[in-house]
């Protein structure tokens, strides 16, 4: 269900506002080892239970009529989109085989290739060295640690119409002294939903109910939170109708709060609800225009100038596409509503434009990102102007600053020395939209003692990132950032920051 309604090294909190500080969790090394062994044995038991199932060869009779059809490719494995894979391709004996395909495609009825069970695993090991989280101010942490994430899933397809998808997770953070809720969850359900697909009125209707990972658009303001150990899951109901170039999506979502006290103790956050409707039209190729309305409800939200129940009505318009080397993604968002006795009026604009020299060696892409989000210009005027970035993407701003009260200009150069390798170098300048509001650190925490301090300049950072897809199953990534702070952060007790991340991932 490629709805993409509601990334990245980030330290995203469970809810996005100036409140909800992270609470360190106590743990011992022997507890982590015991819980990880339990998770591993659970995954191994699931695989062993199904290992007796019929082999792929048993589907050859059902696939004999496929000889006149083109050979379909094996699904591409993406860690955040495992539920979208269609492994019925393995019902065709002409498709190239790999080890353990007998567990990747377990036919339930050889006469109906679309009825099957598929098992899968993700493993990600990430080393991080962070010289100054939160620029060394606001109880920031410095040090080095490992983020280790293990996921395993079962995907049951009952023909073309019914899907039952369940994914478990085991995440630990050895070496991290101060654990946040997104760092560790030793055994819990990441996704568990039922999906229904039906033809309707010349189009396709898709319904999905349960716990799931979802994203909005470019993931500026609502990402899957790929970087930390724990992705952002939602207990949600989704309806998706697609016909021709038109796509209409409705959603009601409650983000899942993670905790690590007992196995399977994550729960829906009933004090934070996001609902809305999106309409999208694809003109040709990748060119599209979309708009959505969303209602954001957060109880007991805290900002620098006001506390109360936050209610935002959100209107977002986005266009994206690519034509002859030129690509673009431009998005504008308006937020209105109330919090406590104050009204809310905030805006943001996000843009990324690039041009790729497709006929030049290494296919260099020259890109420019420009982003603006409002802050609160007058804390005493009974109107809150601070933009709420909802569930933002950490990588987008190098994971140091947040989107509220921001001006961000970032030129970048990306090259491809090999088809499976990309290298990106970027430098960015950041300013506050207004000095009356604070500097915000990721995801949207106000840095103490920065509101009202003269000087809009926040700092400049340089970033280098490399990605290498070694095989369809293995990938390697490297990321390095140096952030030179401005005067407002320095007066608040901050210092320049450095970050290095090295990541190895595996998907089966």
Residues covered by each model-derived region:
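N-terminal periplasmic/intermembrane-space "pro-region" immediately following the signal or transit peptide
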Residues: 2-6, 14-16, 20, 25, ...
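Membrane-embedded beta-strand positions of outer-membrane beta-barrel proteins
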Residues: 119-121, 166, 207-209, 239, ...
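Transmembrane beta-strands of outer-membrane beta-barrel pores
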Residues: 123-131, 168-174, 211-215, 243-245, ...
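Surface-exposed loop and membrane-interface regions of Gram-negative outer-membrane beta-barrel proteins
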Residues: 129-148, 156-204, 219-224, 261, ...
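Signature for the C-terminal beta-barrel architecture of outer-membrane proteins
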Residues: 200-207, 220-379, 436, 449-453, ...
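Outer-membrane beta-barrel "beta-signal"
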Residues: 496-508
């Amino acid at each position: 269900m490629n709805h993409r309604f509601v990334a990245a090294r980030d330290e995203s909190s469970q809810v996005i506002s100036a409140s909800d500080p992270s609470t360190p969790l106590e743990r011992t090394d022997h507890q982590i080892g015991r819980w990880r062994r339990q998770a591993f044995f659970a995954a191994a038991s699931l695989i062993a239970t199904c290992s007796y199932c019929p082999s792929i060869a048993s589907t050859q009779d059902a696939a004999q009529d496929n000889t006149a059809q083109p050979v379909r490719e094996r699904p591409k494995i993406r860690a955040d989109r495992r539920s979208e894979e269609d492994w019925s391709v393995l019902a065709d004996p002409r498709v190239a085989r790999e080890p353990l395909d007998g567990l990747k495609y377990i036919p339930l009825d050889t006469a109906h290739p679309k009825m099957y069970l598929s098992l899968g695993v993700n493993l990600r090991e990430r080393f991080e060295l962070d010289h100054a989280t939160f620029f060394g101010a606001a109880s920031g942490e410095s040090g080095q640690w490992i983020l280790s994430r293990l996921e395993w899933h079962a995907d049951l397809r009952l023909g073309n119409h019914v899907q039952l998808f369940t994914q478990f997770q085991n995440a630990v953070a050895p070496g991290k002294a101060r654990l946040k809720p997104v760092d560790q969850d030793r055994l819990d359900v990441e996704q568990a939903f039922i999906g229904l697909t039906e033809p309707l009125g010349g189009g396709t209707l898709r319904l999905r109910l349960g716990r799931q990972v979802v994203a909005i658009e470019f993931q500026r303001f609502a990402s899957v939170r790929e970087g930390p150990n724990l992705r952002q899951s939602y207990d949600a109901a989704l309806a998706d109708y697609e016909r021709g170039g038109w796509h209409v999506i409705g959603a009601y979502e409650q983000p899942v709060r993670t905790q690590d006290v007992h196995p399977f103790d994550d729960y829906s956050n009933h004090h934070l609800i996001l609902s809305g409707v999106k309409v999208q039209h694809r003109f040709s190729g990748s060119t599209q225009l979309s708009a959505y309305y969303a209602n954001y409800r957060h109880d007991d939200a805290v900002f620098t100038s006001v506390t109360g129940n936050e209610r935002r009505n959100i209107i977002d318009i986005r266009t994206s596409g690519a034509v002859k080397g030129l690509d673009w993604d431009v998005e504008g968002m308006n937020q209105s509503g109330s919090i406590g006795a104050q009204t809310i009026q905030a805006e943001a604009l996000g843009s990324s434009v690039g041009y790729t020299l497709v006929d030049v060696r290494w296919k260099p892409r020259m890109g420019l990102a420009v982003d603006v989000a409002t802050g609160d210009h007058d804390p005493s005027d009974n109107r809150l102007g601070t933009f709420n970035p909802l569930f933002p993407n950490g990588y987008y701003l190098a994971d140091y600053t947040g989107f509220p009260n921001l001006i961000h200009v970032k030129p970048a150069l990306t090259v491809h020395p090999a088809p499976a390798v990309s290298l990106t170098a970027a430098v960015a300048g950041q300013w506050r939209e207004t000095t009356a509001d604070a500097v915000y650190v990721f995801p949207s925490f106000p840095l103490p003692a920065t509101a009202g301090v003269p000087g809009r300049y926040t700092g400049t950072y340089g970033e280098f990132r490399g990605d290498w897809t070694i095989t369809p199953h293995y990938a390697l990534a490297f990321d390095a950032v140096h952030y030179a702070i401005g005067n407002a952060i320095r007066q608040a007790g901050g210092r320049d920051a450095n970050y290095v991340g090295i990541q190895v991932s595996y998907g089966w």
